[in-house]
């Protein structure tokens, strides 16, 4: 199929072949790899430039993860005679490790890695976060501040009822922006004026409510960090019963993106 699609261009299409070493999502099985490589090499409009696999449990199951590493490395090493003969069958790029694989394992054969989560400055494994710097921050601003009495309910379902007079700030962000509704009721916090402030009640589509009683000088327009350097995305994910990958990729298009380049000075 790809060979026929590439034919009109008159140029070979560079392709990578995926080996299924346990993910079950796609690719050829290891014992089918040699035949698949030979078949791709026989097609006039395709050029095999990469060979890779994907680790299904590098952040959860070290004992299992050693198996695809050994299996993949052994497969690549079985192709070494072709490499020594400089045959065009041999892929130029060999890749296996995701972020967890890069941190915890070492391949004998790969020359590329595919870090995803680490590029955001978030570690998939304990013990490495101190060496990484978060590069993505989700922010909003205080839209409204009200003084509410004891017994006043907050948000849908009145899952939060004030047990004391409280200063409540409404923040302009919600699950319509990608902030997870599932975090409701699990003691989430945001950062305002360098102070952690607890969320009250359920996350709504467009707003959240926060107790700012400890911040008497909090003002409308104050910046609010939902996650970033002070509120780790891993904390948000854990309290939302999900994973950092989902938090990062759930931010919706209606959230403005601002890209900053770090100064070299």
Predicted regions and their residues:
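Active-site anion/phosphate-binding pocket segments in diverse small-molecule metabolic enzymes
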Residues: 1, 8-9, 66-82, 88-265
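Active-site-proximal beta-alpha core segment in soluble small-molecule metabolic enzymes
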Residues: 1-80, 84, 90-95, 108-109
């Amino acid at each position: 199929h790809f060979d026929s699609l590439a034919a009109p261009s008159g140029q070979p299409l560079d392709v990578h072949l995926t080996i299924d070493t346990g993910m079950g999502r796609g690719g050829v099985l290891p014992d089918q790899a040699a035949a698949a490589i030979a078949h791709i090499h026989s097609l006039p409009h395709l050029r095999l430039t990469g060979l890779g696999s994907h680790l299904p449990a590098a952040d959860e199951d070290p004992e299992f993860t050693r198996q695809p590493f050994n299996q993949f490395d052994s497969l690549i090493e079985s192709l070494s005679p072709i490499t020594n003969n400089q045959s065009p069958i041999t892929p130029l790029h060999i890749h296996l490790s995701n972020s967890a694989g890069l941190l915890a394992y070492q391949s004998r054969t790969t020359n590329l890695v595919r870090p995803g989560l680490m590029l955001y400055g978030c570690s998939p494994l304990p013990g490495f976060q101190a060496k990484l710097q978060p590069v993505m921050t989700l922010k909003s601003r205080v839209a409204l501040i009200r003084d509410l009495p004891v017994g006043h309910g907050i948000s849908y379902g009145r899952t939060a009822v004030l047990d004391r007079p409280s200063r409540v700030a409404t923040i302009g962000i919600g699950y319509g922006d990608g902030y997870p509704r599932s975090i409701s009721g699990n003691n989430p916090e945001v950062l305002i004026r360098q102070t952690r402030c607890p969320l009250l009640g359920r996350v709504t589509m467009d707003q959240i409510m926060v107790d700012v009683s400890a911040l008497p000088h909090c003002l409308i327009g104050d910046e609010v960090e939902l996650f970033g350097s002070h509120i780790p995305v891993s904390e948000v994910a854990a309290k939302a019963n999900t994973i950092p990958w989902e938090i990062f990729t759930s931010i919706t298009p209606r959230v403005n993106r601002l890209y900053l380049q770090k100064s070299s000075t």
